[in-house]
Amino acid sequence: MGAGAAMIEAMKKFDIKGTFSVIGTPYEETDGGKIDLLKGGVFDDVDACMAVHPTTAMSRVAGECLCSCHYVIEYHGQTAHAWARPWKGKNAFDAAIMCFNAVAMMRQQTEDGVRIDYGFVEGYEQTGSVRDYVKLTLGLAAPTPMIVEDVRKKVEGCIEAGAAATGCTVEYHGEMGYKNRIPNSVLGDFFRENCVALGEPMQPG
């Protein structure tokens, strides 16, 4: 807010025409606050926009970033005693492992820059019984939305393969995160030059 107030005073002093706004973004890292602002028309009349993020490290001008998609996956099976009658069960944990293995092998067919991570949320705690429920999360990121969409189809095939191979059922939901950032190098260079002029240490790059 202080920088915004100073900017307005500078515009008055040097007779710079235009409108300057300071826009706060709630829950922007986890739930896409900027996306909601964009859909709400907040940036419709904006010619240039600069995002500034606080850091505990040395300042830097950010470059490109990946766009992403996040999945919540739930496998449902049939519980049974793991030692007495395991054949009576349908192991949701095995379905999850099958999914993870399929994704791991699928990575070989993805383009450079694709990143995939996954983990258990529920259903991995107990032993001694065939697990009838497992919940997972899976995140993927790629340089462009088109690559994300291509990888999503492959990931969903892996998710469904886990269910098909074990006789379980599966529910999953994939939600797009932010799209990739396209940096403005001219604006970034001006920002860097002004930071250096004010004595602010800057990381290279």
Specify the residue positions occupied by each region the protein language model found.
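Histidine/acidic-residue-rich, glycine-tolerant segments that coordinate divalent metal ions
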Residues: M1, M7-R131, A141
